[in-house]
Amino acid sequence: MLNLQVTGKTILSSIRCQRKMSSTCSSYAFGPYKIDPREVFYATPLSYAMVNLRPLLPAHVLVCPRRLVPRFTDLTADETSDLWLTAQKVGSKLETFHNASSLTLAIQDGPQAGQTVPHVHIHILPRKGGDFEKNDEIYDALDEKEKELKQKLDLDKDRVDRSIQEMADEASQYRSLFDC
């Protein structure tokens, strides 16, 4: 069992340095979809961060638990802590890297909340002034992108929005932010 120190300064040194992608991990699950490990730029034993197939803004990424968990309340305490600590670290690095001034973190938990992939995930969007005319428009845009993603992703078809290479290049750039 993973022993997380939520109030401590560190989690475990094994988590801190497990950022480098393991060559033994051939893929990650995102609901029913397999994610190419080249799209993943940060991972802990319980969570991973990946670039987005259809980003709303530059650096719009997702943080997910490694275990396929459909709803937020189904996460264990350790998974919940690790997921949010991962989101905090990823958000901080990407906000700085993209010279953003704020972050939007969002979870759509369940179909009526706009969740279309049955796997808990946190959207992280570094924000800049004027990126949306009205700040709350980002939530409508998230809902719309989730609906489009559900319609366009088909297990029997290739993803057409961004190429694997384009996503791998972005992930590689972000991965360098987390090297030990």
Curated annotation (Swiss-Prot):
The active site is at 121 (tele-amp-histidine intermediate). A motif (Histidine triad motif) lies at residues 119-123. SUPFAM superfamilies: HIT-like (SSF54197). Residues 27-134 form the HIT domain. GO terms for molecular function: adenosine 5'-monophosphoramidase activity; adenylylsulfatase activity; adenylylsulfate-ammonia adenylyltransferase activity; bis(5'-adenosyl)-triphosphatase activity; nucleotide binding. Its EC number is 3.6.1.29, 3.9.1.-, 3.6.2.1, 2.7.7.51. Possesses dinucleoside triphosphate hydrolase activity. Cleaves P(1)-P(3)-bis(5'-adenosyl) triphosphate (Ap3A) to yield AMP and ADP. Exhibits adenylylsulfatase activity, hydrolyzing adenosine 5'-phosphosulfate to yield AMP and sulfate. Exhibits adenosine 5'-monophosphoramidase activity, hydrolyzing purine nucleotide phosphoramidates with a single phosphate group such as adenosine 5'monophosphoramidate (AMP-NH2) to yield AMP and NH2. This is Bifunctional bis(5'-adenosyl)-triphosphatase/adenylylsulfatase FHIT. It comes from Arabidopsis thaliana.
